[in-house]
C-alpha cells in the first residue's frame, strides 16, 4: 500500500507539474479521501522525507569518492531477498548505460530497503529509480532516459 501512495503522489504532484507547495495536512486529507489509510500515509511521507535527506547526506558523497569504475556491488542477504536477480540485473544495466551512478544506485537501494512491503517487483523498482532521479539535482538526462524506459515498456514497442 505504501508503494501505491508513493506512485499516487509522484504522478499527481511531481510528474504532472502540479503545485509542489502543498501543506502536509492538506496532502494527508487528500490521501485519506483517496482511500489510503492514515498509517500508510504517514509511512509514505516519512519515506519521502528520508529520500530528501539522502541528497544532503555526507555518506553519499563519500560513496562517490570511494568507488572505482570497475567495482562490483555486493548485495547483503536482506537486499537480495528484496531485490531479486531481475532487479539487480536491471540496476547493473542502468549503471552500464550511465542512467545510475554509484551514488544514485545506493540511494535507490536505500529507498527500496526503506519500503515496508513483502512484495517487490521490477516495475516497483523502476518507479523508485524515477523518484530518486527526480529528487537529485543534475540528473535530468538520466531521469528522461529512465522515464522513456519505463513508459516504452508499459506502452509496448512498435516495430
UniProtKB/Swiss-Prot annotation:
Top-level taxon of the source organism: Bacteria
Database matches in Pfam families: DUF494
Family matches, as InterPro entries: Smg
Family note: Belongs to the Smg family.
Protein name: Protein Smg homolog
Species of origin: Vibrio vulnificus (strain YJ016)
Gene this chain is encoded by: smg
